[in-house]
Amino acid sequence: MAGGSYKVKIVDVTKLYDQFAYGIKGHSTALRNYFNYVKEFYPNLANVFIIGKGLEFKNYRKDKSKEDLFNLVPTYGIPGSDPLLVCDVNDKQLYALGRLPVTEASEVATYLDKVKEHEYYINNQATEHEKMQWSKRIIHLAGGDPSLYETLESHLDGMKDIIQTNQFGASVKTFHKEQSAIEGNENLTELMDMINEGVSMITFMGHSAQFKLDFNILNPASYQNKGKYHTFLAMGCYAGQIFETYKSISELNNLSSIVFKLAWQYF
């Protein structure tokens, strides 16, 4: 069923500061105290979805205008860690958690349209197995520098063995950074073709920054995978850093109104 028929409670974060953070605007304690309170009185709550960008405190403590523009729902600590917002006193996570780091209502609408489109695409082709083969395909991207190639590829091969032999039954294709450097455009074309045809997940392991991976995946406008959106799992430094005033690579891709991906996870 479209949307999953969840029972949803919408909470305005600005109403929590007085009740759970001693009136301190933008303080992460408000959310943490609130979710611990909710766990006691509403034990069946399972998922938390934060809608709104957050900032690390160091980015706005000397400039309150940044707080108003970007710290719409605060994160916890430095570096920012949303899971700690939903942890108990023993730092045990209470709920599954995600964040859509938007600053404009139009970005929420764009993302919602992509979710609806993706669900409609899957629900209307679920019984046509040939058309759903793309949902069993996974791409692995092995980055890093020469001293790490063997190690990173070994880790990805271990993940490949698991996802191909468990109930998911995936078909995994691995692209290597050193191979891409040798084969150039030919390797990139194969990667683009796979994404355009549809994959369920792309996993990257290598060096990264907030705005870039060390594997060329181009920008969202380069792809034509409309409806066949995937999850991108990035295992690299700062790949998921969304608590700055500028947009990260994950935000640019997830919030794109064009195509490419639906969700970005990082470790």
Predicted segment positions?
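Cysteine-dependent hydrolase recognition
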Residues: M1-F267
